[in-house]
Design a protein with these regions (language model features):
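Short, conserved beta-strand edge motifs with alternating hydrophobic and charged residues
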Residues: 137, 174-176, 207-210
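Acidic beta-strand-to-loop metal/phosphate-binding motif
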Residues: 171-182
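Charged helix-capping and loop-helix junction motifs
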Residues: 188-194
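Active-site rim/loop-helix segments in enzyme catalytic domains that contact anionic ligands
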Residues: 29-168, 194-202
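Conserved alpha/beta-hydrolase "acid-adjacent" motif
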Residues: 47, 184-185
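The feature marks non-catalytic terminal segments
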Residues: 120-133, 148-151, 166-167, 199-291
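N-terminal export signals
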Residues: 5-25
């Protein structure tokens, strides 16, 4: 069975490092301060944070998972309104769990149907991973089109992270490597972390390269400070989290939206039992992605 067939089958049935501990196994602290993972959008946690989440859970750490943005996406609504599935037009490799169920006639505002459905997938994924708490910032995904929009979003994210750092002293904070990920929402989250590190608010910070799965397998670890080799038992759980994004179950508000958003990333993350942890670059440059 090919990895694409495995992903389809699973979907149809399923549902700056600061410190010196990066290269050592995660150990629970005496105070059991939480490890807080930040997912810019619904699906990032399943793609590139899940193995690290499970590593911390296995070490006895409480794990809190934050959804940063609402994930509005008008193009995703348009995809779900097309029939047949646009993923299969000229490319039959993508096993879309919503096959035969397209043409939904959803409004294309990108929010009214998309946000609750994407968030339902996120919550199902979080449940599969067994996180101890889910926190939803409920920020509009709005760092685009101007520098003002971008920095307004950075400030909003920064304020919310700062509040969590105050609420949970001693927590570690895990972000995505936004400077590598070609998406302003991801970059803005990394910028917020960078500013808070410089202010001394965050002292234990790591960055997982979620979009590494776009690269050839041999290049995904390039520049990483640490490569997590995910144990097979944890990888099975990570795959269950991925399947939550390719499940057709309208009664649970699951419409396989994550798979329609990033099918290639999901296929690659499903197949590669590794995650890639980075430190923030010494010459880090804040600001939006230069396209």
């Amino acid at each position: 069975m090919s990895r694409r067939q495995v992903l389809a089958a699973g979907a149809l049935t399923g549902a700056a490092l600061a410190g010196s501990t990066l290269w050592a196994p995660v150990k629970a602290s005496a105070a059991a301060a939480p490890a807080i993972f930040y997912s810019p959008h619904q699906d990032d946690e399943a793609l590139g944070l899940a193995g690290s989440i499970l590593e911390h859970k296995a070490a006895g750490r409480p794990v809190y998972l934050v959804l940063v943005s609402k994930g509005e996406n008008d193009q995703l609504a348009k995809k779900m309104n097309q029939d047949p599935c646009p993923l299969t037009i000229g490319d039959s490799r993508h096993p879309c769990a919503a096959g035969g169920h397209h043409g939904l006639s959803w409004p294309t505002d990108g929010a009214s149907m998309i946000v609750p459905a994407r968030t339902a997938e996120f919550m199902a994924s979080a449940k599969a991973l067994g996180v101890d708490k889910v926190i939803n910032f409920k920020l509009s995904d709005s760092p685009y089109n101007s520098d003002d929009n971008y920095y307004r979003f950075v400030d909003s994210v920064k304020a919310k992270i700062k509040a969590l750092a105050k609420q949970y002293p001693g927590a570690s904070h895990k972000f995505t490597a936004g400077w590598l990920e070609e998406t302003d929402t991801h970059k803005a989250l990394a910028d917020a972390a960078y500013f808070l590190m410089n202010e001394g608010v965050l002292t234990d910070v790591r960055f997982n390269y979620v979009y590494a799965y776009d690269k050839p397998k041999s290049q995904r670890a390039n520049g990483a400070a640490y490569v997590l080799n995910i144990p097979s038992a944890h990888m099975a759980i990570k795959r269950k989290a991925i399947y939550c994004y390719n499940t057709w179950a309208p009664d649970r508000n699951l419409y396989a939206l994550g798979y329609h958003s990033v099918p290639d990333k999901m296929e690659s993350a499903h197949e590669d039992p590794r995650e890639f942890v980075f430190t923030i670059p010494s010459r880090y440059t804040p600001g939006p992605i230069k396209h």
